[in-house]
Amino acid sequence: MFVKKGDKVRVIAGKDKGTEAVVLKALPKVNKVVVEGVGMIKKHQKPNAENPQGAIVEKEAPIHVSNVQVLDKNGVAGRVGYKVVDGKKVRYSKKSGEVLD
């Protein structure tokens, strides 16, 4: 998967299209990512010892990795490629040619 935790991404599809934010979690087995402030859902929490009333909590839901593009250091969104530099495999932006790792 071309997206890693901590990457700055732009959402390119869905209700949050155009939003730029940081990846909080990458889920490679299901090809999804959790992006900060994107795909917010309301989760109903049952009452428990620390919260006897229960609550409705807003949290980020995973979105499909094809709906985001990685931003390079200049803020340019583009596809990601891989190349070997000094015997080490690194990710780079195909649009700007800049190394991402």
Curated annotation (Swiss-Prot):
Q: Which SMART domains match?
A: KOW (SM00739)
Which Pfam families does the record match to this protein?
Answer: KOW (PF00467), ribosomal_L24 (PF17136)
Q: From the record, give the transmembrane residue ranges.
A: none
Does the keyword field hold Transport? no
Q: Name one GO cellular component term.
A: ribosome
The entry sums up its family as follows:
Belongs to the universal ribosomal protein uL24 family.
Q: Check the record and name the NCBIfam families matching this protein.
A: rplX_bact
Subunit annotation: Part of the 50S ribosomal subunit.
What's the protein here called? Answer: Large ribosomal subunit protein uL24
